[in-house]
Every structure is written in C-alpha cells, then in structure tokens.
UniProtKB/Swiss-Prot annotation:
Gene name of the encoded protein: slc9a3
Locations listed in the record: Apical cell membrane; Cell membrane; Recycling endosome membrane; Early endosome membrane
Organism expressing this protein natively: Triakis scyllium (Banded houndshark)
Function according to Swiss-Prot or TrEMBL: Plasma membrane Na(+)/H(+) antiporter. Exchanges intracellular H(+) ions for extracellular Na(+) in 1:1 stoichiometry, playing a key role in salt and fluid absorption and pH homeostasis. Major apical Na(+)/H(+) exchanger in kidney and intestine playing an important role in renal and intestine Na(+) absorption and blood pressure regulation.
Taxonomic path: Eukaryota, Metazoa, Chordata, Craniata, Vertebrata
Any one biological process term the GO annotation gives: regulation of intracellular pH
Pfam families the UniProt entry points to: Na_H_Exchanger
Residues annotated as transmembrane: 67-89, 98-117, 127-144, 148-183, 197-218, 221-252, 260-294, 297-319, 322-338, 346-374, 383-404, 418-441, 449-482
Cytoplasmic side of membrane: 90-97, 145-147, 219-220, 295-296, 339-345, 405-417, 483-832
One annotated Gene Ontology cellular component of this protein: early endosome membrane
Full protein name: Sodium/hydrogen exchanger 3
Free-text note regarding domains: The C-terminal intracellular domain is subject to extensive post-translational modifications and binding partner interactions which regulate transporter activity, scaffolding functions, downstream events and localization.
C-alpha cells in the first residue's frame, strides 16, 4: 500500500513539473506580446524566412499563443485537483492538517518553482478574478444549503457579532496601531490616522471562505457553526462600507473631510446592507417564478439557478451594494421553492454542480494565496507592525466576543457557554477577502501599501495555518458539543413541530412577540400567498405535511416488508390491481385465493421473477415439465436481436427501468391504500349503505340454496382469471406480470406472502364459526335488526372495534362493516 501511494505521489510530482515547464513559456510569450518592437522584429524575421523558404501548406503547426490562456487555466485547475487527491490519500495527514493549509503550502512550493524558473511572478490572485469568478460560487453554495431554521433563529445574535463586532475590531485595531506609531515603536512610516483605520477595516472582518474551510472539518454543533459562519457572511456590508468610506477619505485627504461625510458613511451602511438584501430577495422571487414554468424544459432548468443567482451578485455590485449579501439571500430565499419546482434529476444536478464549483473555487483560492506570496516586490518587513497587528486582532476579538455574549445571554433562551465563546474567539479567521481588498489599494494615496500587503499575508497564513491546525485539538480538549449528521426520526419531527405550536401559542397568549410567534405567522403567510404564487400546484400538493408523513411511513412499511420477504426467501413481491396474498408466518388455508400463479407462490432461495430461477422441488409433473421446457427453449432457441427504443431527446432525460418500476409499485400501492380511504374521504352515508345492503341480501336469499334447517349453504369463494389475461400496462410504460389461473382448491397450502398493507387482517374463519351460545338443538331466529348487528361475544368482539387496515400503517380507523362477499353462515334464516 505504501509503495502504491509513493508511486502515485511521484507521478503527481512529475506531472506538476511538466505543467510548470509548459507554463514557463507563458511569461515569455506575454512579454513578447507586450513589447511591440520585439514583436515586429520577430514578425519581420519570420516573414523573411517564409519568403526565403516557402514550403507551401503545413499540415500540422504549433500555435501555443492561440490556446495559451484557456490551456494554462485548465492546467492550474488540474494541478489543484490533483493536489487535493494526493492530500486525501493519507487520512492521517488530513485529520491533523486542514486542507486549506495544505493548499497554501502547495501554492508556496509551486510559486517558488515558477519564480526559480522565470524570476517573475506571472501568476497571482487578482481582485477581479477573485471577486467576479471565485467568490460567488462559494457564497451561493453557502446560502443555498443554509439551514434556515438555525440561521433565522439566531439572526439577532449573528447581526450583533457581524455589525457591532466588526466595527469594534476595525476601530480598536486601527486606533491601537496608530497609538503605538505615535509612541515611535514602529519607526518612520508614511501613514496617518485614516491609513491605519483603513487597514483596520480590511483586516478586521472574518472571512467566510476560511471559516467554511476550517469549521466544516471540525464539525462543531449547529448553533456554534451558524453563528460564526453567519457572522462571516453578514459582516460583508460593514466591511464594504468601512473600506469605501476610509478609502475615499484617504483619497480626498484628511483636511478636506467634513462632518457631513461621516453622516453619509453611516447612511451608506444601511443602504448597502439593506439594498443588497433586497436585490437578493427580488432575484430569488424571479428565480422561483421561472422554475415554476420549466416543466417541459427539464434539461436546462438547473442553468437558471446559477445564471439568475450570479446576476443578483453582479447587479448588486453594479449598484455599489453588498454583492455577498445579495447572492446569499438569493440562495436562502429561493431554496424552498426551487427544490419544490425542480424534478429529482435537476435537484441532484444543482446540488453536485454547486458543490463542485464551490470546492474548486476554494481550492484555487488557497493555492493562489500561496503562489502570490512568492513575489519579492510586494514584501516590506516591519517586525513591530506585523507582530502588534497579530496581537491586537486576537485580543480585541476575545474582548468583543465576551462583552457581546454577556449582553446577548440576557435575551437568549439557549445560553452561549464559556467554551462556545472560546471557540468563537479562536475562530475569527482571515482569508482571501482581506488579501483582495489590500491589493486594491492605490500606492499613490497609501504610501505603506507594500507593508499592508505583507502584513495581510502574514495574518492570513497565521489564522489559516496555525489556528486551523490547533482548533481541532482545542475543540476536543474543551469537549465542545459536536454535530450529529443524522436524519431526525419521524417521532422527533412530530414532537418538534408540536413544541413549536405550543411555544407560539404561549407567546400569543402572553402577548409577547418572539421567534416562535414570528415563525408561525410567516409560515401561515407563506402557505396562503407565497407558495401559491411561486410553486406549481403539483408541488404544493406534494409538499403537504400530512402527505409527507404518510409517504415516510409508507417508505418504512416498504423497507420492512421487502427486508422481511428477502429473509423468508419469498418472491411474491408483485403489485397488481388484484388481491395479493402475503403471509410471512407460514402456510395457512386461505378462503380468498389470489391471482398469483402457483409457480410464483412457491418458496425459493432468492427473489426472482423468472421461471428458470425457481427450484424444481415439490411440484406437480406438469410444473416440472414446464420448467424443463422453459430451460430448453431458453438455451437452444435462436435469440433475436434486441430492439432498443430511441430515448434521446434534447429536452428530456429518459427514465431508467428501475425508476419506472419504482413508480409503478408506488402508484399501485397508493391505489390500494386510497381505496381504503373512500368511505371517510367521500363521506359515505351509512344509512343508505345499510339500506342497500338489505336490498342486496333480500335478492341473494331468493337465489340461494337453502337447507331444511333454515341455514344458508357455505360457499367456497375464489377468484378465477383466464389463462391469457394480463394486467394492463401502466401509462408510464412500467413492467407488467402475467397472471396464471388460480387454484380452485381452498385447502391448497401456498407459501406465498400475505401483504398486510393490501389484505384484510381479520380471520376469515370467523364467518364459518358457530357462536358458543347457540347449540345445534336450539336455533333462535333473529330479527331483521339483529341480522345487521352481530351479538357481542368473545368470538366476534373484535369485529365491533375499529379496524386498522395494517399493523404498520397510519390508515384511518374505519368501522368494520359486514362483508357482502362473505354471508354470515351462522345466522339462521327465518323459516316461512
């Protein structure tokens, strides 16, 4: 195993070296393109050689400049992906070192190789590439898969940390650095108060990319994760406003700043944050409406999710609003309606494509953070400034978290403990957002731009590598509650919903408007108005809570039914419109025979619906002859070529055979279950029903064979199906099964299975039993009313209780009616 891994690593290293060798001519070619004189000379010499040696048409030519840019991009993506594969070959490494730290180290190595080969930093992470192409997929993935309940339940806490906490960190860091500078401990720097505040505003914000990369591997509990991650998303508005305000003040000059400008900065915060949120909500509404009408173009509907979400990001950035808030709330607000409108294939496509884009963008970001650092022209070292920056951002982060948490705990139901505060303080990671903002600074106005860039790179490396390495041992040492990735049980869902209703009722009665009250009002508003506008009608029905619970119980029924049948070795898993005989307990006498063939009713060693898989044992000579004939024909006859139906379509994806069978089984199951709901669903009038029963029984008495003692003859009831009969093919092209004639012998002991979901659970022998209080000598002729109401006795008392159609079903309890197909033989008729 070790040799295989070492060989794989060696191959990856050799491939990386090959990529770098291919990338080296890129810089030279780019330099040649930027230098017009050299390009002209090269063209002249090439033209002269062409004139001197005209060889005519060339079959193959090497045109590197033609494919240079896309080729290099594809190679870098390939290198980053291969590096990710190599990291995960060893679980010991990835369990200790975060993937983001490994990618930064890989970027440093590759950047060093490129610098040694070409002596120029030809590959760097530019702000344009980061903000327009790499950041949107990551934020969209975070918003689309956001746990809305936890997010909105802790929204007040998240906004407190995001707004007040970010302003606190930016102001205290900038003022503290400026105070130390005035003391003369940093040397001679070309910076004033506004420059230090500008640096504090860009270094204070918690980075969402870094938080996602580290905290997803730690697996802390949901509340702690959503608070830290929500803060990193929502502090973008504060970061953008502070950065733009102080950057404009620096460009204008400290002497030209007026008091009105500070007021405009405060107003711009609300405009940027609320405007970005509004843009995201509007585009989420548009996306939900568009996906409502994509029923006939299923193939392209996943594209609308990405295109419209990306347009929300670009629109907010065009209007100088918070683009991160726009695409975040676009994903949060549209996820419910989009998932309801899209088909299952499109939902899976969106899920995997979004995860792939986010993971790829995150990989490229951290790798290029390492590559960008290998550039001596951007480095300026100042030990005091760098070390004090690390100290101030860590100390003020702890102070801000402790003070804000102490205030918030007075209003929170679930308190944030000391352990949670330690993790929140330690989880203030900085990343590519700070690096991209500091690169955007203009060196003409900010004299210490190179020092700010160097310090930002050190801060990013320290928080991502050092804090990322130590946060997992810290969480284990503090015994922080971890998240449990499991689907909640149906019982937990029902109790949780009941508690929500109880809490909202308590808040309503007490007159207090809290989270539960607002959530209940929003749910009602969404159900009455929004869902009807942004969901198609079929999606509204399918998302009904009662039906969803019923579907889950049906799924559990089916799983237990199939698992029990496989354990018993039965093969009678046939869903048909006729009755199905399912009996896991063993052979018994059945009054009502099924329409399943005798061959299929035999027990076999595996579940198979083909005759040649049925074991040839305990069968009649005719059955054995049929099996032998089947084997002979299967093996020796000419097999014709299969004819495949053309399933290609530009607008639809053909469903597989398994999906068709699953759909057919579900439809037939629901058909049988819905038949049981007809009396209660359609509002059957039992008075009319009993009157019709009297008429039918009167007509039966005239045509029945009466015996001298006044009793009706007991008939053996069985269903007969013609030999050539078939179940109709379903509309969706599902499978069908041939039905062979049923046996007329009521004493036949079949080992098929009685499906409790389809067959009545009551004992059919009750119709043939004589009550113990009636002797053969004494026969009392009951009245007409007594004929409709059976006397209460231990034997038939269960007939008077509500009848549940399945011991694992949630079907409504129905009153047990007297079956018309089975006349009560123990009730004597009146003698004339």
């Amino acid at each position: 195993m070790g040799r295989n891994r070492s060989g794989c690593v060696a191959r990856c290293v050799s491939l990386t070296a090959l990529v770098l060798l291919l990338c080296c001519p890129v810089v030279r070619s780019s330099e040649a393109e930027t230098d017009p004189d050299s390009h002209t000379e090269h063209g002249d010499s090439h033209g002269g050689s062409r004139e001197g040696n005209d060889t005519g048409f060339q079959i193959v030519t090497f045109r590197w400049e033609h494919v240079q840019t896309p080729y290099v991009i594809a190679l870098w993506i390939l290198v980053a992906s291969l590096g990710k594969i190599v990291f995960h070959l060893s679980e010991k490494v990835t369990s200790v070192v975060p993937e983001s730290a490994l990618l930064i180290v890989l970027g440093l190595i590759l950047g060093g190789i490129v610098w040694a080969a070409d002596h120029s930093a030809s590959f760097t992470l530019t702000p344009t590439v980061f903000f327009f192409y790499l950041l949107p997929p990551i934020v969209l993935d975070a918003g689309y898969f956001m746990p809305n309940r936890h997010f909105f339940g802790n929204l007040g806490t998240i906004l407190t940390y995001a707004v007040i906490g970010t302003v606190w960190n930016a102001a205290t860091t900038g003022l503290s650095l400026y105070g130390v500078f005035l003391l003369g401990l940093m040397g001679d720097l070309k910076a004033g108060l506004l420059e230090f505040l500008l640096f504090g505003s860009l270094i204070a914000a918690v980075d969402p990319v870094a938080v996602l990369a580290v905290f997803e591997e730690v697996h802390v509990n949901e509340v702690l994760f959503i608070i830290v991650f929500g803060e990193s998303l929502l502090n973008d508005a504060v970061t953008v406003v502070l950065y733009n305000v102080f950057n404009s003040f620096v460009e204008v000059g400290a002497g030209n700043v007026q008091g009105l400008d500070y007021f405009k900065g405060i107003v711009s915060f609300f405009v940027v944050s609320l405007g970005g949120t509004a843009v995201g909500i509007i585009f989420a509404f548009i996306l939900s409406l568009v996906t409502r009408f994509t029923k006939h173009v299923r193939v392209i509907e996943p594209g609308f999710v990405f295109v419209i979400s990306y347009l929300s990001y670009l629109t907010a950035d065009m209007l100088s609003l918070s683009a991160i808030l726009a695409i975040t709330f676009c994903g949060i607000c549209c996820q419910k309606y989009v998932k309801a409108n899209l088909c299952e294939q499109s939902i899976t496509t969106v899920r995997y494509a979004m995860k792939m884009l986010a993971s790829g963008a995150e990989t490229i970001i951290f790798m290029f953070l390492g590559i960008s650092a290998v550039n001596p022209t951007i480095w300026t070292w100042n030990t005091a400034f760098i070390l004090l920056t690390l100290v101030f951002i860590s100390v003020y982060r702890v102070i801000g978290v402790v003070i804000q948490t102490w205030i918030l705990n007075h209003y929170r139901v679930v308190q944030l403990e000391i352990i949670d505060q330690v993790v929140m303080s330690y989880g203030g990671l900085r990343g590519a957002v700070a690096f991209a903002l500091v690169v955007l600074l203009d060196s003409n106005y900010v004299g210490e731009r190179r020092l700010f860039v160097s310090t930002t790179i050190i801060v990013v490396y320290f928080t991502v590598i050092f804090q990322g390495l130590t946060i997992k041992p810290l969480v284990k040492w503090l015994k922080v509650k971890r998240s449990q990735h499991k689907e909640p049980l149906l019982n937990e869902k029902l109790h949780g919903r009941a508690f929500d209703h109880i809490l909202s009722a308590i808040e309503d009665i007490s007159g207090q408007i809290g989270h539960n009250y607002l959530r209940d009002k929003w749910t009602n508003f969404d159900r009455k108005y929004l869902s009807k506008i942004m969901m198609r009608k079929s999606a509204q029905i399918s998302r009904d809570k009662i039906l969803s619970v019923f579907r889950e119980l049906n799924l559990k029924d089916a799983i237990s039914y199939v698992s029990e049948g496989e354990r018993k070795g039965s093969l009678a898993f046939i869903r048909s419109s006729s009755d199905v005989n399912v009996d896991f307990t063993g052979p018994r006498h059945s009054v009502v025979d099924s329409s399943v063939s005798a061959v299929l009713r035999e027990s076999t060693s595996e579940v198979c619906l083909d005759m040649h898989a049925v074991e040839n044992r305990a069968k009649s000579p005719k059955d054995r002859e049929e099996i032998v004939t089947h084997h002979m024909l299967q093996q020796h006859l000419y097999k014709p070529r299969k004819r495949y139906r053309l399933n290609y379509s530009r607008h639809k994806l053909a469903r597989s055979e398994g999906e068709k069978q699953d759909k057919e089984i579900f439809q037939r199951t629901m058909k049988k279950r819905l038949e049981n709901f007809k009396p209660t669903k359609l509002g059957t009038n039992y008075t009319t029903k009993f009157r019709n029963m009297k008429k039918e029984r009167a007509a039966k008495k005239k045509h029945s064979d009466a015996v001298p003692n006044g009793r009706l003859a007991t008939h053996s009831v069985s269903f007969h199906v013609n030999k050539d009969s078939e179940v109709e093919d379903p509309a969706d092209g599902g499978i069908s099964f041939l039905i062979t004639p049923a046996s007329n012998d009521a004493d036949e002991t079949g080992t098929g299975i009685d499906n409790p979901s389809f067959s009545n659970e009551e004992d059919q022998s009750i119709y043939q039993m004589i009550p113990p209080w009636i002797s053969n000598e004494e026969t009392v002729i009951p009245s007409q009313r007594a004929r409709l109401q059976i006397p209460r006795s231990p034997t038939n008392f269960r007939r008077l209780t509500p009848l549940q159609l399945s011991n694992r079903s949630i079907d409504a309890f129905l009153l047990a009616d007297i079956s018309d197909e089975h006349p009560l033989s123990f009730l004597p008729e009146s003698s004339m």
